[in-house]
């Protein structure tokens, strides 16, 4: 008996060491990759590369990237959250619900180049939007919508049944229970889905090749929303950081600028993820009554 216990403890120690070694390996691998991209990107950078110029800089592309992801989340986040609520709270088990879930899973696994082609045919050819920020954002929202939907559904279903039962028992309606009890409790997990969706939007290139174009000529003193050089005009062509990296690498142009754009894009995703996580945790504490 003692020998079996000793053997089990030895196996436990060995497995613990193995798991720690795997964790350290992946941490070192991630740190090395991020360090290589960031250090290599800023090593050859010059102050002019950070300007908001038409060529030879990343300022306009950085703004276009943030603006496009913001527009895509404005479209996909509300629709995805409401779709997740419907699937978790209202959808009845049956053929249509199963078919809807299969469609969502299929949509989430579609190659981005296929979605880009679809966006080109629908938003550019059929709707006549032309290559623009709006067409790109709508196409990216197609990719991010399934992720937000499934995250919201899983978050609501993962809550204890007592949340719903207690709220309904106190006289709240189903709608009040969802918005005042369930959703606040799901904020961290829903934000995780939105963060992942935003991360995919930041890095998309194949979709945007068909839909946004490569224009980055902006006039920062021009706030006429109908002007093609107005930064806030959603109907203008817009080159994002990922498209800029692709153009520079494939055309063999300024490699230092491409490296800088890669480093800035990685830092942008990292900063957004950290900021959104901190904000969602603070919001979760406030809704739970831990903070005043």
Question: What do the predicted segments below correspond to?
Answer:
Residues 105-143:
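Generic hydrophobic transmembrane alpha-helix motif, especially the helices
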Residues 91, 157, 195, 231, ...:
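C-terminal transmembrane helix and the adjacent membrane-cytosol boundary/short C-terminal tail
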Residues 49-56, 208-266:
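Interhelical loop and adjacent transmembrane-helix boundary motif
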Residues 2-18, 36-74, 244-255:
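Periplasmic/extracellular loop-to-transmembrane helix junction in inner-membrane transport proteins
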Residues 111, 170-171, 184:
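Glycine/proline-centered hinge or cleavage motifs at structural transition points of membrane proteins
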Residues 174-212:
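Transmembrane alpha-helices
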Residues 1-22, 278-292:
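Transmembrane alpha-helical segments of polytopic membrane transport and secretion proteins
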Residues 72-104, 117, 276-285:
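Transmembrane-helix boundary motif in ABC transporter permease subunits
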